């Protein structure tokens, strides 16, 4: 993802805080190496060109992008001279305003990012998963499986940089 793309929807022309997809949750198209890709069918399609819901930019009649703050063309929201329009924060789970995901009444629709099951979120998950071996029931620090570790300081295997006896060069 480039630095001029929105972290919520992955589109350029605005920042995440001005994203027309709404409050805290984006579409999560890019996982940035963390293994998470969220796409919700419960959220309406919002055009990043005009900021209206019900269609995507590829189907928009506008020829140029509109500012998400004032709705006029010729500039983007971060450069808008109008006062910033406040957007109500929405639940990450259902997309509705007025509550946070942890307080959402739609708990049966919540999907855990760790185990993939519905009915709870990651912080409440009882099935911890080790990122080293991929097994459930323990975390990496308690993993009995040995893995080849490499030192970032000297490049040798078998130890970490904090255990390296080679002097660091600046």
Curated annotation (Swiss-Prot):
Keyword Transcription regulation applies: yes
Zn-finger region bounds: CCHC-type: 4-21, 45-62, 65-82, 89-106, 110-127, 128-145, 149-166
Phosphoserine carried by residues: 42
Keywords: Acetylation, Cytoplasm, DNA-binding, Endoplasmic reticulum, Metal-binding, Methylation, Nucleus, Phosphoprotein, Repeat, Repressor, Transcription, Transcription regulation, Zinc, Zinc-finger
List of residues that carry N-acetylserine: 2
Modified residues (Omega-N-methylarginine): 25, 27, 72
Major localization class: nucleus
GO CC terms: cytoplasm; endoplasmic reticulum; nucleus
Disulfide bonds listed in the record: none
Any GO molecular function: zinc ion binding
PTM section of the record: Arginine methylation by PRMT1 in the Arg/Gly-rich region impedes RNA binding.
Ranges where the record places region RNA-binding Arg/Gly-rich region (RGG-box): 25-33
Keyword Repeat among UniProt keywords: yes
Subcellular location(s) of the protein: Nucleus; Cytoplasm; Endoplasmic reticulum
Residues with PTM N6-acetyllysine: 8
GO biological process: positive regulation of cytoplasmic translation
Annotated SMART domains: ZnF_C2HC
Origin: domain of life: Eukaryota
Pfam families: zf-CCHC
Function per UniProt: Single-stranded DNA-binding protein that preferentially binds to the sterol regulatory element (SRE) sequence 5'-GTGCGGTG-3', and thereby mediates transcriptional repression. Has a role as transactivator of the Myc promoter. Binds single-stranded RNA in a sequence-specific manner. Binds G-rich elements in target mRNA coding sequences. Prevents G-quadruplex structure formation in vitro, suggesting a role in supporting translation by resolving stable structures on mRNAs.
Subunit and interaction comment: Associates with the 40S ribosomal subunit, the 80S ribosome and with polysomes.
Name assigned to this protein: CCHC-type zinc finger nucleic acid binding protein
Organism the protein comes from: Bos taurus
Chain's gene name: CNBP
């Amino acid at each position: 993802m480039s630095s001029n793309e929105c972290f919520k929807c992955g589109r350029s022309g605005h920042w995440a805080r001005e994203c027309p997809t709404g409050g805290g949750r984006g579409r999560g198209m890019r996982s940035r190496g963390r293994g998470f890709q969220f796409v919700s069918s419960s959220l309406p399609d919002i055009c990043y060109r005009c900021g209206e819901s019900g269609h995507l930019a590829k189907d928009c009649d506008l020829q140029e992008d509109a500012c998400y703050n004032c709705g006029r063309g010729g500039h983007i929201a971060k450069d808008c001279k109008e006062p910033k329009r406040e957007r109500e924060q929405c639940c990450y789970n259902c997309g509705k305003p007025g509550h946070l995901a942890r307080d959402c009444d739609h708990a049966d629709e919540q999907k855990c990012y760790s185990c993939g099951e519905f009915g709870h979120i990651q912080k409440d998950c009882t099935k911890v998963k080790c990122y080293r071996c991929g097994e459930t029931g323990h975390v990496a620090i308690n993993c009995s499986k040995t893995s080849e570790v490499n030192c970032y300081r000297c490049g040798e295997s078998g130890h970490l940089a904090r255990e390296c006896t080679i002097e660091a060069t600046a």
